[in-house]
Amino acid sequence: MATIFDPIKLGDIELKNRIIMAPLTRCRADAGRVPNALMAEYYVQRASAGLILSEATSVTPMGVGYPDTPGIWSNDQVRGWSNVTKAIHGAGGKIFLQLWHVGRISHPSYLNGELPVAPSAIQPKGHVSLVRPLADYPTPRALETAEIADIIDAYRVGAENAKAAGFDGVEIHGANGYLLDQFLQSSTNQRTDNYGGSLENRARLLLEVTDAAIEVWGAGRVGVHLAPRADSHDMGDENRLETFSYVARELGKRGIAFICSREKEGEDSIGPQLKQAFGGPYIANERFTKDSANAWLAEGKADAVAFGVPFIANPDLPARLKADAPLNEPHPETFYGKGPVGYIDYPVM
């Protein structure tokens, strides 16, 4: 039976193992949200992953919500990412760019004084990440129906720029309470147009963005990231199994490369149902160990497993897992911020 160390084909991509590096925001980009040499070194250190899913990368300046996260809308950003992908490919790795719009999870200080946008003008609970002094999230501005085409186009251009930058494919960030998730889940979408109300309407934007990426890349080089638990950024849905199963089925009809779901083990996990509904390669994510990951593969609950924090602290994670070697302890105080400390200085075996 397959283990996480065995190769797999996800869509059009052949992977050397099933150990996926999960998307991890690290806030190390240069001015203008341009990827830099430090980021290239960080990813190269982790090129032994079967596939790297890049940190979330904004498709438009109005889609940012954190300091020093990268973008993919400018020529300078494309050039910066090109250096990253060349280095990763030189080290034998493969990488998809995660395309991102934060929606309401932002603040005017990141948006040139503008309000964040969202499906509906519903203020999220909580404080803006990494802004001091602490500031509540503002009430966002509801997007006009006519503006939604521009959002889809921003994702399309982001997908085109990702191709120009040399990525192996793209992953649509539809998780964790960001814009596409806000449209999808019932608690954050009170629209009465074609993008709200029914489940089909709430899922429309995510699927139209996915279709735009498919037009650029082909379905075999597009993945989608989901988070059915709704445990980030004040989310919630009236029937998460129905909602996310519908999305999985629709994505399955499109034949995309994979879905990756932040849906950890547990009696309430709907990961196996999503895999069945999707019918294609399913990447499980969150708090998996070597043993639990292999168990999910053996039980047919997943086809690959994405690791997040373990990859932060262990650049050589696949080798450590295979050797049953001890793992480095992560240092959360350096997860976000400038410089190499806690970024490229974790030891390898």
Give, region by region, the residue ranges found by the protein language model.
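Flavin-dependent oxidoreductase catalytic cores
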Residues: 1-349
